């Protein structure tokens, strides 16, 4: 089982908590009241946990010569004149969706068709730039 701290203790000893999680690679659970729990985890370990959530879009060559990229995991689809334009549009749409998802997280987490998007959204939001997002898309 993971180590647990009560919220008040975690607040008082935040520096020690941070050092334990970061330097010792040990996630911790912080509890408040009877039902509220959060996990504190290093970002690199979170990225590792999410690495299995692949975001590889399907590439469709349309009859008019355009390219459609279909990212079924997030229900995002783009169409552009070239593959490179479609990739750029997809990256922008994925970023916009991820930001919107987090701004309205209570809505999306409680929507049965959007709840499964959470790990993909978090994976995108942990990227530092468009190149990292492009890498996630394997494009």
Question: What is the predicted function of each stretch?
Answer:
Residues 7-23:
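The conserved cystathionine-beta-synthase
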Residues 71-84:
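A short, exposed loop/beta-hairpin motif centered on an aromatic-Gly-Thr core
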Residues 2, 36-37, 75-77:
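Short, mixed charged/polar active-site loops
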Residues 53-73:
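Short aromatic-glycine-(Arg/Gly/Cys) micro-motifs in beta-strand/loop hairpins
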